[in-house]
């Protein structure tokens, strides 16, 4: 029996295919690291990108690069912004006697969408979580304290999520400003326990703001 011969150039094609598979696997791996995206969803997105017009994927890549280069935390409140300070902090029409404290930048967008709140914000960039090894020093709490010391602030609205970590963080902040001239309040009941602010509907959030509970005065 004559031995089978490998067609000329087949090695190059096999290596090229392996490189393509590796690149695809790498993309799927990166996509699966996104919040709420599992391996199956990441695979579906990756194959969709391969089927779309190349101009779309180039535009997507350019947008991802641009947003990382141009968007940064506001030096005042910590919300993501292109200008510094952000539009909210720079708006002289906002109520500067009130600061609403949230966990993440996306929570600001949720509260703004209600058109119910006209004060300022402060983004903690997380919550106190001993299990995760996150303490007060790992958040922007010291910056919040500095803003209060500058004067003019009369109320701090604690809009952390109704979770164990969110409640722990809120309690810490209540004790931090206890005895000061600043009163603290908490969003009223209505948000589901263990839920995230960003998933609540606008009406529920608006009612929670209007009916917030005073914790200290």
Functional labels for PLM-detected ranges:
Residues 25-29, 43-47, 58, 62, ...:
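Solvent-exposed alpha-helical segments within well-ordered globular domains of core cellular machineries
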Residues 1-20:
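N-terminal amphipathic/basic-hydrophobic helices that include classical n-h-c signal peptides
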Residues 22-24, 29, 33, 43-108, ...:
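Cys/His-rich Zn2+-binding cysteine-cluster or related metal-binding knuckle/ribbon modules and their
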Residues 42, 91-160:
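Extended interfacial segments that mediate partner engagement and assembly in macromolecular machines
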Residues 118, 145-157, 161-217:
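Long C-terminal interaction/binding lobes of large macromolecular proteins
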Residues 60, 73, 85, 107, ...:
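Glycine-rich, flexible loop/turn motifs
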Residues 3, 33-35:
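A generic structured-segment signal
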């Amino acid at each position: 029996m004559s031995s089978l011969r490998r067609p000329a150039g087949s090695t190059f094609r096999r290596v090229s295919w392996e490189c393509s598979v590796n690149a695809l696997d790498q993309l799927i791996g990166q996509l699966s690291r996104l919040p709420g995206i599992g391996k199956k969803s990441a695979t579906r997105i990756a194959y969709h990108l391969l089927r779309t017009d190349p101009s779309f994927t180039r535009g997507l890549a350019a947008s991802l690069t641009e947003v990382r280069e141009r968007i940064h935390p506001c030096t005042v409140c910590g919300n993501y912004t292109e200008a510094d300070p952000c539009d909210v902090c720079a708006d002289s029409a906002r109520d500067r006697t009130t600061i609403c404290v949230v966990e993440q930048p996306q929570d600001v967008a949720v509260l703004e969408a209600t058109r119910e709140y006209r004060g300022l914000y402060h983004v903690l960039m997380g919550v106190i979580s001993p299990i995760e090894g996150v303490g007060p020093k790992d958040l922007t709490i010291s910056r919040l304290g500095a803003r209060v010391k500058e004067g003019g602030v009369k109320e701090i609205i604690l809009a952390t999520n109704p979770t164990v970590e969110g409640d722990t963080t809120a309690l810490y902040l209540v004790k931090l400003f206890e005895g000061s001239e600043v009163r603290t309040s908490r969003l009223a009941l209505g948000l589901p326990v263990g839920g995230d602010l960003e998933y609540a509907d606008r009406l529920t959030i608006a009612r929670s703001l209007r009916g917030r509970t005073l914790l200290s005065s």
